[in-house]
């Protein structure tokens, strides 16, 4: 057994203290023959500190495309030649999407908008949408609408938004290579305000943007410092017309190593499968991740890419004897 896994068994599994950056890097560098042991340990950590339940979430885009930022991985940027065009979703369609999400057994519905930050129109739409969903659907409402002011944070709290997603996307040292229209520090400031407001913080990123293994370890350590309630792990699904559109996808074994490493860095955090897993991991890899530290999934489609059918994921959870987290448990 590699020394880092022996260390993690005592430090993380028994004592609940996550690995530091050096420890995460050691896990990311484990040879293939030790990957099953790393995944098994990560699963034990998840079961010990989070329990067997899996949180299920659906997402929908209130405003798609036309974003002024230049995130190099994103087909919703108005600066690139991707086929995505700006579209607004009306409130009845938003409510219907929430109803369909709830029917899958999901406990959370996240409203997303492709913006730098919300303007007055978007805040009005969000307020109307959240109120309409709360009136008709028994589901928690989360939001992801970019960088916020303190006033906007307070408004979201007043609306009853229980969790806010704002991804750092990658580590601080690599961020300028994928975004130039705003800074990593600006994103961190929004997350600070959200945390202080009492809303739950959801913050993760995308692996496979061109970062080094060392930078993946840096990213895990920075997320652990933030200590978010939830970390969504995306794997790059290269989008045509974007600067990263010709990048190779993350190798499946590297993705699984990252899942184990991030779990060992953050033993108590909800670690959620997000975009790109279908391409990077397929069905077998998805199962391996759920047995290697993952304890939440986004079901259905993503913002601009297709996901797995919700029934496929729910059948997999049933097959693995992993109960879906009940709504009452998240209130």
Curated annotation (Swiss-Prot):
Necessary cofactors: [4Fe-4S] cluster; [2Fe-2S] cluster
Details of cofactor binding: Binds 1 [4Fe-4S] cluster. The cluster is coordinated with 3 cysteines and an exchangeable S-adenosyl-L-methionine.
Give the first-level EC class, as a single word: transferase
Report which residue ranges the record marks as coiled coil: none
Domain Radical SAM core residues, every copy? 52-277
Where do the annotations place [4Fe-4S] cluster binding?
67, 71, 74
UniProt keyword Mitochondrion present? no
Q: Cross-referenced InterPro entries, in alphabetical order?
A: Aldolase_TIM, BATS_dom, Biotin_synth/BioAB, Biotin_synthase, Elp3/MiaA/NifB-like_rSAM, rSAM
Q: Which SUPFAM superfamilies match?
A: Radical SAM enzymes
Give the top-rank taxon of the lineage listed in the UniProt record for this protein.
Bacteria
Fetch the SMART domains from UniProt: BATS, Elp3
Question: Catalytic activity, per the record?
Answer: (4R,5S)-dethiobiotin + (sulfur carrier)-SH + 2 reduced [2Fe-2S]-[ferredoxin] + 2 S-adenosyl-L-methionine = (sulfur carrier)-H + biotin + 2 5'-deoxyadenosine + 2 L-methionine + 2 oxidized [2Fe-2S]-[ferredoxin]
Gene3D superfamilies, alphabetized: Aldolase class I
Q: In which pathway does it act?
A: Cofactor biosynthesis; biotin biosynthesis; biotin from 7,8-diaminononanoate: step 2/2
For biological process, the GO terms are: biotin biosynthetic process
Q: What is its EC number?
A: 2.8.1.6
Alphabetically sorted, this entry's keywords are: 2Fe-2S, 4Fe-4S, Biotin biosynthesis, Iron, Iron-sulfur, Metal-binding, S-adenosyl-L-methionine, Transferase
Alphabetical list of NCBIfam families matching this protein: bioB
Q: How does this polypeptide assemble, per the annotation?
A: Homodimer.
Family designation: Belongs to the radical SAM superfamily. Biotin synthase family.
Role: Catalyzes the conversion of dethiobiotin (DTB) to biotin by the insertion of a sulfur atom into dethiobiotin via a radical-based mechanism.
Q: Which protein are we looking at? A: Biotin synthase
